[in-house]
């Protein structure tokens, strides 16, 4: 199994290194015979001797073309003859390529920016992560006395925790009496002990959470300051910092450094990406957070170090568990695109598509188009086109809704209509598909480069799904599932890739044609559903819709929806297929991309309405949840309004317990850097004035008090709130917490802010006069 590939230089010559795991043993293979090359298209082939004379300089050494070869290739499907120019060293290419491109005899150069080791994997047909080797995984995490705003790695590392299949341990240099904690004499000894752990356990994969940006750079810096070498690599090398676009990534030679942070950011959508939030989202279990100021306080006073050590151990354990969850998926993506997992796990979906296309282009003898230069990139960024169709929703509370959507709408359109840069407006074809509205033509005489690859991916995914159904082996089933999910990620990224400004196979005409067909098909479905089957379509978003038959029973709605799916699929061309997604008992739509539904099991599904940030008080979150329940579970909007009025009444009468009023906000930088003083900053400044050490990362819980002046002056620390002495600002909580949380829902039913507040009734006019007369 190939883990990684790179090259080293000996006597001025490049040597490819392949890091492998074979029969449980780690090994390195070398290849001294692979030469770097680029392609050049000449105006006149007789000029090749002139081109061969081009030289440049690199580090005082003359760089030249060492060999040439004329080759037949294809460019966007059309035959082309180019020259393959060979060089002595990979670093010669960036030194000389501009001179070659600018030579009067040269039209253009190609494939001059593919890294040497990646070029080797492509040309030799080598696939990383292929095979059944059992890989050893180890996760680690550090706790430090670093505070944002100060010099990076100024404060010491106080704990290093690690976890693998044998469990989790913590190394520290202050006395902590716990069975999983090993105490050493100093920070220097702790780092040395960690190095020994890595040597003894010899993991193939080192898992971190944000290790690229924090743990590894911090460890490297501290080791430097303490004069310690950090040979974490299997070749005895230290971790190597690499620039990847606008981020820094850390490589450990011979081991895969798997930073989960990048993978999780790409894979799941969360309001915040702390380790605690991610763990809860994936495993449904909470994880305690110990803040930077608490860690510093425990270290300084010696009190509460057991809690910090437990937190550190859990960080490593949780990172290991998350690593085991996500690693197999990334391994499948690595196999699919044919590049090392270290790169794949740090790639955007656009880059994953590109690496896959580069490998397939080589296999098909296609010359890869060049990436855009700065000017072309800027031009592409300015281009725009119409996206998917989104219908303004029908407001109100609806019963008996069905959800219908297209299976892989955009990939299906690309394949069905052969949408590809090499088929676009191609002359001399017998048959074309013409995109609606935009009128771009796509040749149907031969399968386009990208549609043919996409079809193979979708066919493979269907085959895997069939195997999964037939398999009785749970492990085989899980591995097949990882593979089909990897294919799904790649397949669903092709449409976006066409419009990705940095793409080699960028094609704005392709992207806008795909969305134009998408709009046509969803509109066709809507028309047929309403006119032929009597449904009312309530909401459409790009590739799916919600609909109902007003007054019909649930069973009839479901039956007719299934009949419609069968009917429409017989009319749709090619791979296009509509699916019945599910039935919902009740639902309402506020605006585009904001709605809530309840299914037959009583599960509430919301989109765009959630209040999940911590700066919402418990009373706001609780009221919103009760409002949703009243509307969706009981079908009673009036009950929801009554709930809000009751809460505003209780707030007005000071009947809400203070713990439900606490608003939490985090201090994100040193206090002196804040220009706008929000309530949490004002509270933090008052704490600091009393001698409390306030550090970035600290979370302030505050309650807003009744009174005059700005809110920042009326906010106090939650723990200091005394109901006997203090009154909270009921108006603030009604206007800024509860009503905004429920208005986004109740506006859909025509309610305004004034309709939702409890009003203290006064007897006025005739009623008051009559009551007086009765007396």
From Swiss-Prot:
Changing residue 754 to E: In strain: AL585. It comes from the Archaea. The keyword Transferase applies. One of its GO terms (biological process) is DNA-templated DNA replication. InterPro entries: DNA-dir_DNA_pol_B, DNA-dir_DNA_pol_B_CS, DNA-dir_DNA_pol_B_exonuc, DNA-dir_DNA_pol_B_multi_dom, DNA/RNA_pol_sf, DNA_pol_B_thumb, DNA_pol_palm_dom_sf, DNA_pol_type-B. Gene3D superfamilies: DNA polymerase family B, C-terminal domain, DNA Polymerase, chain B, domain 1, Helix hairpin bin, Palm domain of DNA polymerase, Ribonuclease H-like superfamily/Ribonuclease H. It catalyses: DNA(n) + a 2'-deoxyribonucleoside 5'-triphosphate = DNA(n+1) + diphosphate. Its EC number is 2.7.7.7. Belongs to the DNA polymerase type-B family. This is DNA polymerase. It comes from Pyrococcus glycovorans.
